[in-house]
């Protein structure tokens, strides 16, 4: 995977966790969308794309270049990368050098939603498959 090679070249330790996406996706939703009712989640199609919480303005976040800048500045020791269509999760350690431009969402000529979240789930960066949506950055202690 091109993403893994790029990260390793930056000195980031990458471990591929098999079949962990659904578990991490659930944790992401429980952390960042816990204030939404089931009905609200249904209305914004959260089950389809977690990033709808941002595009439907359900929580305030940084967008576009401000999101990239915030992601580049946030402390990154350990974090996860997970994708919309891939069951595996990448665990990154020693990720201090990870930057927004290092996130690849073009996988085999198919644009993917890419979610990056720190291992404590205190912030998230989302690079969507839609050119006109995102990227988004949200940190829990921002509010």
Where are the regions a protein language model picked out?
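Structured alpha/beta or helical-core interaction and ligand-binding surfaces enriched in interleaved
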Residues: 1-133, 137-143
